[in-house]
Amino acid sequence: MKRINALTIAGTDPSGGAGIQADLKTFSALGAYGCSVITALVAQNTRGIQSVYRIEPDFVAAQLDSVFSDVRIDTTKIGMLAETDIVEAVAERLQRYQIQNVVFDTVMLAKSGDPLLSPSAVATLRSRLLPQVSLITPNLPEAAALLDAPHARTEQEMLEQGRSLLAMGCGSVLMKGGHLDDEQSPDWLFTREGEQRFTAPRIMTKNTHGTGCTLSAALAALRPRHTNWADTVQEAKSWLSSALAQADTLEVGHGIGPVHHFHAWW
């Protein structure tokens, strides 16, 4: 079987539970070789984000050139992009190198609700990046921000917003329903072929730091092994559920701790 080379384009987390660090752990846990391009140095921990230092867009582009000119990249995950010029740099390089299997975790809001992208960056993201992306993975607040619409409060509203996002030009949409008041935590996959509902019981743990990063990285790592997104989503969600179920065995920080990426080994 061909070895999978996976790239993450994202910000950092020195506490190890989210961002680049979580992505690389996820790639390794799922049998993919991980490469990384850093878009922002983030001072954060299990209690929140303290500060963000944005990498110069030219240097983000230089990192992308270094990887794409030398390494066969089979699959890519995009996370925090921080500003308009970084969105533009990433979109341009994806187009230049004809990169396939791109999963975009639409990191747009901090847990506090504060925006992590300016309105101009969101506009560039819609026009330049989304048409090149194979799958986006917004939660409900992120979907609302992308659509400039109210937060979906029901599953029906979630369905309507998922369809609207697909119409914006990306290949597929995985709408995450964790913010709904529903014991099953429904997710919906929207593709050009149809729609599919996924459910999983809520796992009772406070340690959910980096779950969005981890899921999108898992989707990227697993996509080359499947012929469709539905099977990829099913395997990624199952693996993440196991990582969440073992999260309380870790002892990391005094806030919202990380999931256990290496639960299968220790």
Predicted regions and their residues:
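Acidic-glycine-rich active-site phosphate/pyrophosphate-binding loop
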Residues: 1-2, 8, 19, 183-198
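Phosphate-handling active-site elements
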Residues: 30-35, 196, 222-236
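Conserved N-terminal subdomain of the carbohydrate kinase-like
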Residues: 2-8, 28-111, 115, 262-265
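Conserved phosphate/ATP/ADP-binding segment of small-molecule kinases
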Residues: 119-195
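Charged C-terminal helix
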Residues: 3, 54, 230-266
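Short, small-residue alpha-helix embedded
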Residues: 145, 206-229
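Short pre-catalytic strand/loop immediately N-terminal to key active-site residues, enriched for Gly-Thr
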Residues: 9-15, 195-209
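Nucleotide and nucleotide-moiety/phosphate-recognizing core
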Residues: 88-96, 171, 194, 229-231
